[in-house]
């Protein structure tokens, strides 16, 4: 059994399960919430090692935190970095069943 570097678990925070992410899964794409300092090569390596799939490309985006009012005080939600991972043909990841 091959060993998995524990740092890969720090790069991938969680899968994103939204309506838009579910529609993207029909086109061989998976969306993950990733660490804010993670680079595309790190994300690609982590997904390939953790899920045993081949990654075609990685696109990243940062969703800026919204300003919200809670009980009369204003605050800001945290920024979230997401990675849209496109898989090679024939490879699939089912994030709805859990890790």
From Swiss-Prot:
UniProt KW keywords: Ribonucleoprotein, Ribosomal protein, RNA-binding, rRNA-binding
Source organism phylogeny: Bacteria, Pseudomonadati, Pseudomonadota, Alphaproteobacteria, Hyphomicrobiales
Protein name: Large ribosomal subunit protein uL23
Gene Ontology terms: biological process: translation
Organism: Rhodopseudomonas palustris (strain HaA2)
HAMAP family membership: Ribosomal_uL23_B
Function: One of the early assembly proteins it binds 23S rRNA. One of the proteins that surrounds the polypeptide exit tunnel on the outside of the ribosome. Forms the main docking site for trigger factor binding to the ribosome.
UniProt similarity note: Belongs to the universal ribosomal protein uL23 family.
GO cellular component labels: ribonucleoprotein complex; ribosome
Coiled coil stretches, renumbered: none
PANTHER family: 60S RIBOSOMAL PROTEIN L23A (PTHR11620)
Xref: Gene3D superfamilies: 3.30.70.330
Subunit structure as annotated in this protein's UniProt entry: Part of the 50S ribosomal subunit. Contacts protein L29, and trigger factor when it is bound to the ribosome.
Entry-linked InterPro entries: Nucleotide-bd_a/b_plait_sf, Ribosomal_uL23-like, Ribosomal_uL23/eL15/eS24_sf, Ribosomal_uL23_CS
Single GO MF descriptor: rRNA binding
Domain of life where this protein originates: Bacteria
Pfam families: Ribosomal_L23 (PF00276)
């Amino acid at each position: 059994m091959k060993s998995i570097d524990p740092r890969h678990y720090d790069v991938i925070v969680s899968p994103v399960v939204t309506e838009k992410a579910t529609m993207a899964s029909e086109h061989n794409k998976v969306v993950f919430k990733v660490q804010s300092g993670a680079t595309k090569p790190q994300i690609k390596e982590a997904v390939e090692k953790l899920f045993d799939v081949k990654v075609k490309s990685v696109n990243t985006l940062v969703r800026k935190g919204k300003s919200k009012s809670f009980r009369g005080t204003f605050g800001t939600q945290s920024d979230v970095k997401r990675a849209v991972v496109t898989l090679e043909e024939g490879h699939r990841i089912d994030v709805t069943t859990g890790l």
